[in-house]
Design a protein with these regions (language model features):
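Compositionally biased, intrinsically disordered low-complexity segments enriched in Pro/Arg/Gln/His
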Residues: 20-22
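N-terminal chloroplast transit peptides
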Residues: 2-4, 11, 27-48
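SAM-dependent transferase fold signal centered on methyltransferase-like domains
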Residues: 33, 47-50, 55-735
């Protein structure tokens, strides 16, 4: 049958029908009906399976096309009001809207909404760089700039009011002199007329009348007749206010809005610029700069979508070149009171180190108290011991090798900013310095003061760190700032002199291991407690939906507030010269930098890790101050010397966790720390009597003295909420 059907097809030249045509399908179905039942069944089953698969493909493609058509019809224009998850179609591309704070940014719909490249490379790389991990950084920056800006705007307003009052006083004085000159001229004219017409008897009365009227009109600020007679001008324009007696002249400057300008030097998507414009109410202008034209186009797109074209100016160019263009500007023209072209705030948030931008930034920000915000994400350089040569070339100092490396990194960054500014007679004042996750963020005020710059050498230190032994350290200032009485004996002045040679040897006095050198680095305070407190005071007023990281901000700023130990009181009776209002004392040095970790110390002497509260209680009972550092959990910051810290650790081991015999060998750091190198008699005496304080008192682990038991639960040290919590990869390709 099959052979006959094939021969019949060739004889009549019937083409083989494709399965996608309905007519051919009908023809084949008719032929199958003529065939044997079994052959008909097998042929029909295969045919209809094939037709069904094709129909499914057609159905899927049709549904996709319909979905795309529906999405195209639902897509909104760039001018639509921004909203979360909004679909925007612009210039042939589709975008999805992401909200952070009060700003909205557009990301390509083809890419992931919250991009995060895993080590396996599962997700697509970004075409527009957006890192949601740094929302904490951006939230904190908005609050810090707002706290700084409120004070800066108030300072500008006070200076402007003072200038207006000075100009107004000069204008009033000139007006009085003109009025007096006019009055004297009228009186003289009236006296001459009276002498010529009526005689001397009537001159006195007429003169008194004219003089009285003139004084009355002058007091009211009107004097229309006199002004008309003397100048010949019409008197319709008001020159005074008869109700309150205050003069209003065109020469007196009127109150104006204070300018507040911000530079987002490395803007990427423009998210920071958008947030600063939306969330800082007194911001008048924000410049969003980026090197790549693709990034600038993205910035313009986001600015247009957020309807902020009047506030944000996008610039395509090198950030260093852009900032150097403002280097020659002065903050204020003393003769004409011209506003400065320099920025009030410059935000540096690069991918990696900010070191190449610092020299230009300190010259482009206002030098009468401008704010510099700096982020450095290269913690592998300034907080590790792997690249000391790279750290020195970028920050001018060597990193610390040890548990306190992150605080050392902050001080290296501040040292780089301070040394860059000092070349131009600029002094820095750190307001807030934080080590966060994988990056550092510092907020620094810049002001012109060659006198304050002289303190920099005495606020710069090197660190001798026993990183291979017990972990102790010693600091050494490069110079000394000494307070001396002046020649009259009624005042004092600061004298800047050389420091002594290194006061410590190459070996650690506690364990005998070799020390390593770190620095030079910043030795001044890391924070301004008043500035930090102002931010904390604003947190309860914030909308938690807008600022989603306020819980962590509160915890970290509370730690920053607590870790700032006040300097010790002066031992002499000399009174330092007064510090200008609004400035920090340039002579203050952080006498107690860095911290120690009880778990690390217990590892040295091979004992059970002591309770943090017990160690703090022992230090407090001995009269020392204790707090903790924001850089790492489990840290203790204190003004106690390392010699006493090891006394506390030895006493803890003696009372609570005796060391097993043979656990510490003579080649270990703990051998000398525990006093095992001393004679047997001395060891036995110490074991019986225990450690004593410097005053000969017993060491007591007074846990009841510790008041930092968390009554209010704060997120002081956040655990990474998900995997791959880091800086992410650079953006690739056009948006």
């Amino acid at each position: 049958m099959i052979q006959w059907l094939t021969a019949w097809q060739k004889k009549f030249q019937v083409p083989k029908p494709p399965s996608r045509h309905r007519a051919s399908s009908t023809f084949l179905s008719f032929l199958c009906m003529l065939l044997a039942p079994r052959l008909q069944f097998q042929f029909a089953r295969g045919f209809f399976r094939k037709c069904g698969g094709i129909n499914r493909v057609i159905s899927i493609r049709t549904s996709h096309a319909m979905s795309a058509a529906n999405a195209q019809s639902e897509a909104k224009d760039i001018t639509a009001s921004p909203a979360i998850g909004q679909h925007i179609h612009h210039d042939g591309k589709d975008y999805t809207t992401i909200k952070e704070g009060l700003a909205y940014i557009l990301v390509p719909s083809a890419g992931p909404t919250v991009p995060q490249t895993t080590p396996k490379g599962d997700n697509q790389p970004q075409s527009v760089f957006y890192n949601p991990i740094q929302q904490f950084n951006r939230d904190l920056s908005v609050l810090a700039i707002k706290a700084y800006g409120e004070e800066a705007v108030a300072r500008k307003k006070a200076a402007d009011d003072k200038k207006r009052k000075t100009v107004s006083a000069k204008s009033k004085k000139r007006k009085r002199e003109e009025q007096d000159a006019k009055s004297n001229g009228v009186e003289k004219m009236a006296r001459l007329d009276d002498e010529a017409g009526n005689g001397k008897a009537d001159v006195g009365e007429e003169s008194e009348l004219v003089e009285g009227e003139t004084r009355e009109n002058t007091a009211m600020g009107v004097d229309e007749a006199t002004t008309t007679a003397a100048e010949g001008k019409d008197t319709d324009k008001p020159v005074g206010n008869a109700q309150n007696g205050t003069a209003e002249t065109s020469s007196t400057p009127k109150p104006k809005q204070q300018t507040f300008t911000i530079l987002d030097a490395l803007s990427a998507t423009g998210l920071r610029a958008l947030r600063y414009s939306q969330e800082i109410p007194f911001t008048t202008s924000v410049t969003a700069n980026d090197l790549l034209p693709e990034a600038t186009r993205t910035i313009n797109l986001n600015v247009e979508h957020n309807r902020l074209t009047s506030k944000i100016n996008s610039v395509t160019g090198n950030a260093i070149t852009h900032m150097y263009a403002f280097a020659g500007e002065t903050p204020l023209d003393s003769n004409r009171y011209k506003p400065s072209k320099k920025y009030d705030v410059i935000d540096l948030d690069p991918y990696g180190t900010a070191a190449p931008f610092l020299d230009a930034a300190v010259q482009a920000v206002r030098d009468d108290g401008g704010l510099l915000c700096v982020t450095c994400t290269d913690a592998g350089v300034w907080a590790s011991n792997g690249y000391p040569e790279k750290c020195y070339s970028l920050y001018g100092g060597l990193p610390i090798k040890g548990m306190h490396s992150h605080e050392g990194g902050l001080r290296l960054i501040l040292h780089a900013i301070a040394s860059s500014a000092a070349r131009y007679g600029l002094a820095i004042e750190p307001l807030l310095s934080l080590s966060i996750d994988f990056y550092a963020r510092v907020f620094v005020k810049i002001h012109k003061s060659p006198a304050d710059v002289k303190f920099l050498a005495g606020k710069t230190m090197v660190v001798y760190s026993c990183d291979q032994g017990c972990g102790a350290w010693e600091t050494q200032l490069l110079a000394r700032n000494l307070l001396k009485p002046n020649k009259s004996g009624k005042g004092t002045y600061w004298k800047h002199v050389f420091a002594q040679a290194p006061t410590v040897g190459p070996e650690c006095q506690h364990c005998g291991r070799n020390r390593h050198l770190a620095g030079p680095m910043w030795a001044g305070p890391l924070h301004d407690v008043n500035f930090v407190q102002r931010i904390l005071d604003e947190l309860p007023k914030l909308d938690k939906e807008t600022y989603q990281t306020t819980t962590r901000i509160e915890g970290m700023l509370t730690l920053a507030l607590e870790e700032t130990l006040a300097p010790p009181p002066r031992t002499d009776e000399l009174v330092p010269p007064p510090v200008p209002k609004g400035r920090a004392d340039p002579s203050v040095v952080d006498a107690f930098p860095f911290y120690f970790i009880p778990s690390v110390a217990s590892k040295v002497i091979h004992c059970v890790t002591p309770d943090e509260i017990a160690i703090k209680g022992a230090l407090l009972h001995a009269g020392y101050r204790v707090t903790r550092s924001h850089t790492k959990a489990g840290t203790i910051k204190t003004d106690a010397p390392w010699s006493f810290i090891w006394k506390v650790m030895r006493e803890w081991s003696r009372q609570r966790s005796p060391v097993k015999e043979g656990a510490i060998r003579d080649n270990m750091p703990g051998w000398k720390v525990m006093g095992l190198d001393k004679p047997k008699e001395e060891q036995e005496k110490r074991a019986l009597d225990g450690e004593k304080t410097d005053e000969g008192k017993e060491i007591v682990f007074a846990e009841w003295l510790v008041k930092d038991a968390d009554k209010k639960k704060l997120v002081r040290y956040q655990i990474n909420p998900r995997e791959n919590w880091g800086p992410m990869n650079r953006a690739k390709g056009p948006a």
